Amino acid sequence: MKKLNIIFAGTPDISAQVLKDLYKSQHNIQAVLTQPDRAKGRGKKVQFSPVKEVALANHTPVFQPLSFKKNPEVLEQIKQLKPDVIVVIAYGIIVPQEFLDIPRYGCLNIHVSLLPKWRGAAPIQRAIQAGDTKTGVCIMQMDAGLDTGDILNTLEIEIQETDTSQTLHDKFAKLSIKPLLETLEKIEIIKPEPQQGEPTYAHKITKQEGLIDFTKSAWRISCHIRAFTPWPGAYFILDDEAIKVGEFEILYQNTDNRKAGTIIDIYRSGFDIATSDKIIRFRQLQFPNKKMLNIVDILNGKDLDKYIGYKLG
């Protein structure tokens, strides 16, 4: 395999894992691009992005432009490095055509969906929310559009019924390096393939989307909860408070035709609520300003029986 000079662009954990794996290859990481440092937490302490932490640990130069319009000098610095390839995954900053034109073999984007399905910001969450049974990693030749570039390589994976956005994210973090290295190995001869099929869009997640609609089927609610775990978290409103849900299971048919959203019963093992077709049992709940707890632990300090028969929403 030919040794390539690579610039890497990414910001969150998933990007950091791919970068770690890329360092283990024979390729040369010339520089890393990541978002600017942010003040986080109650103390507003400045924190580096996960990608920056990995880059610094490997003594690699780091560029952190606010944008390429505000920091055009970064483009010039990248040009001077004359990279063969720029690899991009979850960078979070819009790149201009001038950026795309710099590397010899162009810019490769690692996108975690089977394009053209779920173009955009939240492909993992939207795939689970929609009830998809498969997804994958696409290595895409970047162009000026939103995830519209030609496909260079694909790795397909199944979405399990127990997968959440977190577990699927972790799978992608581990698996993405394989199709990337395969693509880099064949970069001089690989034939780009235009995306085939009708595109769908993975719009950015909002906090309000976590609200559970109990008039839907138990399966749809399951997809909803798993899609929004861990963020923003699925929840229902009880006494004007947002109660986040944790572990759950789908039980029997709603044979008594209880109205969807009715709290059927509360046991030490769970909090049962009617959906449009079945009963769903929540084994864990999180009340405002509290930790996620098992129902048995909540019952030790809170009277929940008064809510039996109460209809949510």
Curated annotation (Swiss-Prot):
GO cellular component: cytosol
EC number in record: 2.1.2.9
InterPro entries in the cross-refs: Fmt, Formyl_trans_C, Formyl_transf_N, Formyl_transf_N_sf, Formyl_transferase-like_C_sf, GART_AS, Met-tRNA-FMT_C, Met-tRNA-FMT_N
Domain of life of the native organism: Bacteria
Alphabetic keyword roster: Protein biosynthesis, Transferase
Enzyme class: transferase
Pfam families: Formyl_trans_C (PF02911), Formyl_trans_N (PF00551)
Catalytic reaction list: L-methionyl-tRNA(fMet) + (6R)-10-formyltetrahydrofolate = N-formyl-L-methionyl-tRNA(fMet) + (6S)-5,6,7,8-tetrahydrofolate + H(+)
Binding site for (6S)-5,6,7,8-tetrahydrofolate: 113-116
Keyword Ligase: no
A molecular-function term among this protein's GO annotations: methionyl-tRNA formyltransferase activity
Family, per entry: Belongs to the Fmt family.
UniProt cross-references to NCBIfam families, sorted A to Z: fmt
Stated role: Attaches a formyl group to the free amino group of methionyl-tRNA(fMet). The formyl group appears to play a dual role in the initiator identity of N-formylmethionyl-tRNA by promoting its recognition by IF2 and preventing the misappropriation of this tRNA by the elongation apparatus.
Protein name: Methionyl-tRNA formyltransferase
Organism: Francisella tularensis subsp. holarctica (strain LVS)
Lineage of the species this protein comes from: Bacteria, Pseudomonadati, Pseudomonadota, Gammaproteobacteria, Thiotrichales
Gene expressing this chain: fmt
